Amino acid sequence: MTEKQWKKNDETEILIEDMGKDGEGIGHADGYTLFVKGALPGERVRVRLMKVKKRMGFARLMEVITPSSQRVTPVCPVAGPCGGCTLQHLSYEAQLEVKENTVRNCLQRIGGVDLEKVEWLPIQGMNGENESPWHYRNKAQFPVRMGKDGKAEAGFFASGSHRLIPVESCQIQHPVINEVLAVVMDFLREKGIEGYDEEHHSGLVRHIFIRRGYFTGQVMVCLVLMKETLPEEAVLLERLKKVEGFTSLYISVNSRRTNVILGEDVRLRFGKAYIEDEIGGVRYQISPKSFYQVNPVQTQKLYARALDFAGLQGHETVWDLYCGIGTISLFLAKAVPQGKVVGVEIVPEAVENARENAKLNGFENVSFRCGAAEDVAPGLLEKYGADVVVVDPPRKGCDGSLLETMVSMAPEKIVYVSCDPATLARDVKRLGEMGYELKRCQVTDMFPQGGHCETVCEMEREDK
C-alpha cells in the first residue's frame, strides 16, 4: 500500500494520543505524526496541515469533534493565538498530571531510569491554601508595535512568529504589572509616541519591561527605546509614582537589529538601582539584567526541596554551579553555618549581583567565582573539597565536560535542578554511567498555564 503524501492545507480527522513538551496535542494520520496546538489527549479533532516535513507535520486545530472531559474555557480572550500560555484550555489538575508524566516518561525513555527504584514525590502545584495558578508572575516583557489605528499597542508575539497579539492585561501577571502596562500605554497613545517597526527598523519604543518583588511589592519599570530620549518623560514618571510600590525607572537604549530585548546601555532615570525580594528569609537585589525566577512562591518550594535532597548537616562544602545571582547559593549558605558554599557563574554581572546579595544578607561562608565551572572547579578543589554539588543549568543541560568535572570532584551527592525534562534525562543517564544513582525526584510547577516545569533530582555516589 502506498503511503499517503500529505501537503500543506490538507484537512483530516485524527485522534489525539499524547501531549508534547510544549503542550501541543500529538496524533497520527495514516502513520504520519501531527502536532496540533490546542488539542488534548483523547480528543477527536479535525485539523488542517500548515507545515509538512518528512517525518512529521504541524497542523491547525479546525474543530474539536469529541472534547476531553478535562477541557476548560480559557480565562484569557487571546489564549489561542498568544504564544504565552499553551495550556489554559486544560484543567489545572490535568496540567499537573501532564507535566509529571512528561518528566517520568523522559527519565524512562531517554534516561533509561527504572522508576521503581526511585522515590517519587508528588508534584508541587499552585493549588494549596491561599495559592492560585493565576497572576503569579513577577516579570513581564511586552513588545510595543504600531496598531492599525496608527497608535502604539503592546502585547505578546504569536507562537513561533513576531506577529503581535495586542493585550491590555495578562492573566498570569501580577495585577500591579498590568496596572503599569496600562499607565505606560495610555501615556504613549496620548502623546502619539511610536512603537517599534521591525520591518523598517524605525519608531521609538521597543519593549516595556516590568519587574515586581513578590514579597516586597517593589516595582521596576524599564523602557527599551531606539533612542535615549523619551518625549515628556517627566509626565510619565509622575504617573508611575502613583503606582503602589513604584521604585525605579530605567531607560535602555537598543538600536540594533536584534531579538535581544535589553541594550548594552541601561540607564537609571529615577529611584533605586535595584528592587529587592525575599525567598525563604533570604533577601535579593534585582537589577534589570539579573536572572531571577518569575514565580517566587514556587521557587521557595523548589529551593526547599533542593535543600532537602542535599541532606546538609551544617558543616559541608557545597558547590553551586550556574549560580546566577546567588539565589540557591544563599539558601545553601544559610543551611551550612559551619561549612562553605562556592558559587560559579560565567556571567560577570550576575557574579557581582551574587556578591552584593551575600553582603546584603551578612553571609561570610559563601564565595563566588566567575568563569565556566569546568575551568574554575579543578583549581579550587584541593582547597575546598566537595561534599555536595548543586547544578541548575539552562535548558540545554550540562556539557559533557562539566559532567566529567562534577564526577571528578567526587561529591557524595549531586542535586540536579532542571528546567527541561529531555536534557535532564540525558544528563541523568550520563551521570549514572559515571557512578551516580538517581534516588529521589520531584517536579515543581513553576509555570501554571504553560507547558514548562522544573524538576529536582537527588543523585548519590554508588561507592560512597
Describe the function of each predicted region.
Residues 2-15, 21, 228-464:
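Rossmann-like S-adenosyl-L-methionine
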Residues 46-48, 141, 319:
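Hydrophobic beta-strand signal
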